[in-house]
């Protein structure tokens, strides 16, 4: 991980590959995991927990109660063959998913400035979740979609501090994101392409869900995870967790495609 040239100038951001399967008489339909029933498979554990939190967020919104996503996923998925184990689920690990939230700056708030960045590990547990003070004057908080208010800036870190923290954590890690290039540009950071997994650029997803274009994270979460996200105010923690789950749902395909490209 290194600072981009732009930042330097400023110093004077599980399903396996589908093979041929026996066709059952009844089509298999993935249903949203209910809250009154524990998930039957390990991969659904994290989705189960996230759906509980999303539903709780909706209930709290109705009564005007503030809600934040938990830092730890209680239902841990360890089905993947990685060096991480259930015991190590809170460690940073090899894989990091990132998502950012932005506020509006400039005339009519049309330009975007970083205001929050969240990182989760392979198991969806929060590694970092910080609010960032925009360097420009905020002209539109975009609270209705970003969930960010002026109050969040009371304990926010400076852009430079956020950048340094991200740089330190992401060093030598595999970064998973959705249209992650934009987040890195907002942070004025670069990351080796060989260590970046972008769910928005995965060809099978583009072909299946977006007619060759880049599918939205919301679309992928609904189609692949049967999970409704971004229904109101966004949460970068929620989005980072969804991104990691989407990667894990087709991890073998992602990794195979990645090896072909960089090895």
From Swiss-Prot:
Subcellular compartments: Nucleus
Chief localisation class: nucleus
Biased composition (Basic residues): 17-27
EC number: 3.1.-.-
Region (Disordered): 1-27
GO BP field: ribosomal large subunit assembly; rRNA processing
SUPFAM superfamilies, A to Z: Ribonuclease H-like
Cysteine disulfide links: none
Keyword tags: Exonuclease, Hydrolase, Nuclease, Nucleus, rRNA processing
Domain of life assignment: Eukaryota
InterPro entries, alphabetized: Exonuclease_RNaseT/DNA_pol3, REX4_DEDDh_dom, REXO1/3/4-like, RNaseH-like_sf, RNaseH_sf
CC terms in the record's Gene Ontology section: nucleus
A GO molecular-function annotation: 3'-5' exonuclease activity
Domain Exonuclease: 95-247
Role, per record: Exoribonuclease involved in ribosome biosynthesis. Involved in the processing of ITS1, the internal transcribed spacer localized between the 18S and 5.8S rRNAs.
PANTHER family linked to this entry: RNA EXONUCLEASE 4, RNA EXONUCLEASE REXO1 / RECO3 FAMILY MEMBER-RELATED
Family designation: Belongs to the REXO4 family.
Name assigned to this protein: RNA exonuclease 4
Lineage per the UniProt record: Eukaryota, Fungi, Dikarya, Ascomycota, Saccharomycotina
């Amino acid at each position: 991980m290194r600072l981009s040239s732009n930042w330097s100038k400023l110093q004077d951001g599980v399903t396996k590959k589908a093979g041929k399967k026996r066709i059952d008489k009844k089509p298999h339909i993935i249903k949203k995991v209910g809250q009154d029933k524990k998930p039957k498979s390990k991969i659904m554990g994290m989705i189960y927990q996230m759906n509980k939190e999303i539903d709780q967020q909706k209930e709290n919104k109705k009564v005007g109660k503030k809600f934040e996503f938990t830092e730890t996923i209680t239902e841990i998925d360890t089905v993947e063959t990685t060096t991480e184990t259930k015991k190590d689920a809170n460690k940073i690990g090899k894989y990091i998913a990132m998502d950012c939230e932005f506020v509006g700056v400039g005339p009519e708030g049309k330009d975007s400035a970083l205001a929050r960045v969240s990182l989760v590990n392979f198991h969806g547990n929060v590694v970092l979740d910080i609010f960032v003070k925009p360097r420009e004057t905020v002209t539109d908080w975009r609270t209705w979609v970003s969930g960010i208010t002026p109050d969040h800036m009371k304990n926010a870190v400076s852009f430079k501090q956020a950048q340094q923290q991200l740089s330190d954590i992401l060093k030598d890690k595999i970064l998973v994101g959705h249209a992650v290039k934009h987040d890195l540009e907002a942070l004025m950071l670069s990351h080796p392409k060989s260590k970046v997994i972008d769910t928005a650029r995965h060809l099978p997803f583009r072909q299946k869900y977006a007619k060759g274009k880049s599918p939205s994270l919301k679309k992928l979460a609904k189609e692949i995870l049967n999970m409704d996200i971004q229904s109101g105010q966004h949460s970068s923690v929620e989005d980072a967790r969804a991104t990691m789950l989407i990667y894990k749902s087709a991890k073998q395909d992602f990794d195979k495609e990645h090896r072909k490209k960089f090895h």
